[in-house]
């Protein structure tokens, strides 16, 4: 067969490498993750109440975006899961881990908020026919340009774990007020807590067990990601949570807490420090760089992700306080 406009030649190393570079990178990411990545391993924090803990890190292909927590509660009539982790692969591992713990079927999944590291596993539960519940403000995020842009970026930055098959999944049931249900004798209270970390923040309380599934309202033992959050309302939400009669907290990030008050206060105090230092600078028309350089960060500089998160947290808070300055 004659070929026009092209003269076949034997591939060299230089001509072959670009063709295979993308495939090789993806393969190496899979191999690296399978060897080194943290396992989705449940830990029982109270009888019948389990959690899996993600890494205190930014999401990368190497950690498979396993940087957030999920929890599940085993009852006599089925399992309730809180959050879906940061990729379909992680969600499948979570489903398998639950099956190793109990033969009970998964009945419900509750979304604490629609951030990527908590929701990119939702499609696995959706495809299994599990009822998904979330706060109605999550609908605004799903229909936003930001959600689509974040998913597009994740497909590039977190491949192969987030890919063209990863999709945004709406809840089956949207709630706006305090919602209670009982399964297998266990009472669950879904309490709207936003706008705080996000507009759709939803916490899960198990009153009899004294357990609070706090989502990203609480980052235990690390600097939180503030992003575009209204930190003032976040502080108000934490103050409300401090009035709850709970002994154990499952945070959105970090290990479970049995010192509920202390860990709620750590996140709250960090946010208050941001608002105080950046608020003073904004009111005094002090440039951000100068204000950031002279601020005292010593109480938080030792915490994981301080270098990755603190500066952008401070800058976003500076902009927020600048808008509200008289």
Tell me the role of every PLM-derived stretch.
Residues 4-27:
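Bacterial N-terminal signal peptides that target proteins for export
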Residues 76-80, 88-134, 244:
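Active-site metal-binding motif and surrounding structural segment of the metallo-beta-lactamase
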Residues 233-286, 290:
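Divalent-metal (often Zn2+) His-rich catalytic cores of metallo-beta-lactamase-fold enzymes
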